[in-house]
């Protein structure tokens, strides 16, 4: 409805001029262009075309017109009006003041027609256009400021708007091929109509793989074209952390209220999604007048956008490369997660899928850690003074505790009856028997001191798994939990942080972003109580044993000592597949290696751990 904002200067004897102005603005606003044209001096077909095209050229989603002052001098009058146009881009409307002249015609008044009636300064043959300049997506950086997203080939799919014969058909078929919703297809129509006719209008960016998959279908979209460019978008040195980008509007983006335009590259997971708004910034939008030849005549309105902000992470590309190299020769699926033991900063996250086995999720996976978890009951027993490295603890075979039978998997050779030897060889039955010395609360408390189940968060989507252990309800359950089976579930990240406890003396919540910063512990949570120094000292000595003379001897390296513990457990949901672990630290870097295998041998994880430790940069 036309808003009347004060009519002034109209003679009392002739109020019809105000009625003519109101009728013209109302017809124009409502899209009744024939009625509007009949109230002008112009050729009806020309006026109708001008009014209709000006609206479509802007891709407008709404128009509101309001009357302003009117002055009358004899047989002529000058009317001012206010226009507010919704450009459909989630930003403020374009508002301006226009004016036109009216001439007395018989008993009424007609608008003296020219293109300038629509917008002041619009001349014959001119057209309106909306230019949107999207700032380049800002990078995700490693701890030294190097980009985690290397340049890679990218396909920009778009149109030359002046060559599109049917924008609706083009947008509808593009939406069908790429999965855009019908409402988004309508926005694409608006983009095509509003853009300069001769410039390439990018509608969507695709990775080479995605383009190859869709190319046949895209080839059937009328008037569509594409070009190859190089962008930092679709490849990543750390995909588990950075996440993926694409053009889909995810539910989370809608819930977050992030500005989204069809074809815009958005983060779909990981840090790319969590920091979508920061990385993309906001576009610069201009409403311009262009000549018939496509040259820009003037800028009518400009909304200046803002560049995005780079996000700096804790990732160390040298450590990441060491993890990837260590996994590259593995014939099975596996993963490596490394953290700075003294801070919890995540240094590397790598995974490798092979051997027809499922992928290992280094952050959100939920796995039983097997004997690698024995560092937890060991710390609990050392804290209470119930055992020491030289305690006489036989490696039973088999063991029956709390009505449950336990055996050593893989088999353990005949050992000296000393706890340090049991630990070095990951003797499961020694720990199931030692469960008799623990009450259920002591084991779950110790697990919490290693960060298992402690509420923390990272700015990643989906959120990583924090680990879990239920309070055992019986001696048999305590025994099963003591060897990392039973109710114990962890991710590789959880166990890397647990290894960091032994190296640094206390647990630190993980962090992945240093700028902009954010909390890692959930509100109101406190850090776990740290172990006493003598407990950590004894635990370190015990963790030297597996590599020096125990189940992980294959990981022995010259130079700085490598500490660790191994483990194996069935892969949840895959009884014939085992998870094989090495959890340890060297030179301030704590890490966890997980490999899937169809055997119970520790070697796959041990050999990856050896290579990773060897490839680590000198500290």
Report each predicted region and the residues it spans.
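C-terminal region of N-terminal signal peptides and the immediate post-cleavage residues
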Residues: 2-28, 33, 507
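Second-shell loop/turn segments in exported
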Residues: 11, 23, 38-39, 86-89, ...
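Short solvent-exposed beta->alpha transition segments
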Residues: 12, 16-19, 30-80
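Small/polar-residue-rich segments within soluble enzyme cores
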Residues: 82, 95, 103, 110-114, ...
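Hydrophobic/aromatic beta-strand elements that line small-molecule binding cavities or substrate pockets
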Residues: 97-104, 581
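Short pre-catalytic segments that frame enzyme active sites
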Residues: 117-134, 139, 148-159, 164-168, ...
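Beta-lactam-recognizing serine transpeptidase/beta-lactamase-like catalytic domain environment
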Residues: 290-300, 333-370, 380-597, 601, ...
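Short, gly/Ser/Thr-rich active-site loops of penicillin-recognizing serine hydrolases
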Residues: 523, 606-619
